[in-house]
Amino acid sequence: NLDCINFPMRKTKIIATLGPPAEDPKILIKLLEQVDVIRINLAHGTWDKRDPDNHTDKIKNVQKIAKTIKKPIAILVDLKGNKIRIGDLIKQTIDLKKDSIINVRFTDERVARSIDEIVVNAGYVFENIEKEDIILIDDGLIKLLVNETDDENQTLACTVQEGGLLSRRKGFEVIDKVITKSGLGEEDQEDLRKLAALNVDWVALSFVNQASDVNQAREVLSSIDNQMRVIAKIERLSALKQLYWIIKASDGVMVARGDLALESGPGELTGLQKTIINQTVAGKKIVITATQMMESMKTSRVPTRAEVFDVSNAACSGVDAIML
């Protein structure tokens, strides 16, 4: 009985991340009939119109079908931000076995050369990594221990501590080290202009550290006379120190639990989520809870009890939307 919760209940919206199956118009229609917002992540796919997975077509298809079914569907797009990601693998996926050796090479090349190699297109990161550092990939699902560093070839020889199936473009982090740059890069600024031309409703800024990051996006939009609304993704502990000002500068915030948990540890995440939600609600701004909500339904038709509780708890906490 939710009436026992001493909190003004809201009609929590559903945000759905657009995946490859939704490229089928029939599936996309069914999806749009059930959700309120479609989210597109610019970290996956390209702007190249020759690419069937290009961003422009995805956005226009959603807008076209929403108009056809006469349902107002908002579009939320995540900018890439400065998050470090691995490049393309030599195969669609590789199976990293526990205790096996994998090389991480920092290079401008976008594709790995072999089955036992991962590439990262951020050379400056190599200088910050040392022997015995712990690397986390794909929100910590893959865990590597750095055994050796090869300065000449900018390569790390690593042992797989936690393995599993790995696919391309997954996030790359190093425990206890900040390797992402703050602010809006040139590519993000250009992407913002493209999204404005496509009449996107919301943009989510990745790895916001301070209010000036949000203001920078506002300045870009203002220069082209666009009023797109801005969501600040809270993914860094450093952002919590500036949370009041970030909330004030933005139209809303997203509790991006994947990267936030990597910094805080899973034990602290519940309290941090509550803090972010409460402060955002108090500031009368939009708040979204994201990452691994109903995650098991990628492979199961029924969510786990823990997932049901997670979604219900977020709704009871006063979030405006949950993101799948």
Per-region residue spans from a language model:
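Non-catalytic helical/linker scaffolds that mediate oligomerization, partner binding
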Residues: 2-324
